[in-house]
Amino acid sequence: MIKDNDNSKVALITGTSSNLGINIAYRLLEQLPSSTNVTLIVTSRTLPKVKEVITNINQYSKTKLNRTGQLEFDYLLVDFTDMVSVLSAYYDLNKKFKKIDYLFVNAAQGVYSGIDWVAATKEICRNPMEGVTNPTYKTQRVGVKSNDNMGLVFQANVFGPYYLIHKIKHLLQKGGRIIWISSLMSNPKYLSFNDLQLLKSPESYEGSKRLVDLMHFGTFKQLQSEYGIEQYLVQPGIFTSFSFFKFLNVFTYYSMLMLFYLARLFGSPSHNISGFIAANAPVTCALGNESQSVKVCSVSNRTGKEYLSYQEVDTTGSADISAYLEKLCHEWDLTLKDQIVNTRQP
């Protein structure tokens, strides 16, 4: 195990097997000083995915980077829609690590049921740029609950990761950085304060990302003042996502890709397409000196050259959201107080 010293860093990336997650790992290794000793904590719901992503990151480091520092891997088998699994992750981290330097909250679970192709055709023909930037034709199931009786998307993308942070603040204190991945689609219209767990929403994924925005603005100042933890909110733009491939065939996939490139060519800065470009804002916030009071966005120009932009966020209701999440944390602390679990069981 790498010794804990000034030249060692520990990074935890949730959803590491996703296109964004693995590219966060690639960029982090590339942008840290080459002599830095790095421990990457890879997360997935399954052991085969963990093994695959570790192999890919290790191969990338050996073939693409000229690193002199050590690279070690650890893993968590964690399902954020299962509170016992989240608690298990906490126990494992607490047992093995004295500090975590970077936590990338890359939770992006949806309950998609497919694509409304008729609506997609109409939307793209009517306004091609809007149709591939803010699509409304991806259909989502309504009312899906987890086995913990919470809104599944709410738990996966918001409360599950929030509860893990609640438990491991002592590992992040005095300099740790938390990077929450938001979305281009986190518009206030997608969230009702009468439905915070998104059980009635036909746009639960987008609503969960609006909750992430509000949660950040309701908590980042307190994390900084009480624990010395810096929290950032980022938006990766539009890029190819592994999770949506199952709804596309070869023709529709390449048609989508062509539309993405055309949108970028005609001036859309949000169509990064590449997961590596999408990872620019998360890694820059982890290593740089960005503002915590705006959303930091990965964007690119017509030729694909990356840069950052900054988005002001409507923070109305942020205090209410943070209070609600803290209340849930207290309730689950009581529920789980006698629970003992083992995260190493695949």
From Swiss-Prot:
GO terms for cellular component: endoplasmic reticulum membrane; lipid droplet; mitochondrial outer membrane. One of its GO terms (biological process) is ergosterol biosynthetic process. The active site is at S182 (proton donor), Y205 (proton donor), K209 (lowers pka of active site tyr). Pathway: Steroid biosynthesis; zymosterol biosynthesis; zymosterol from lanosterol: step 5/6. The keyword NADP applies. It catalyses: a 3beta-hydroxysteroid + NADP(+) = a 3-oxosteroid + NADPH + H(+). NADP(+) binds at L20, T43, K49, Y205, K209, S241. Pfam families: adh_short. Its EC number is 1.1.1.270. It comes from the Eukaryota. Belongs to the short-chain dehydrogenases/reductases (SDR) family. ERG27 subfamily. This is 3-keto-steroid reductase. It comes from Debaryomyces hansenii (strain ATCC 36239 / CBS 767 / BCRC 21394 / JCM 1990 / NBRC 0083 / IGC 2968) (Yeast).
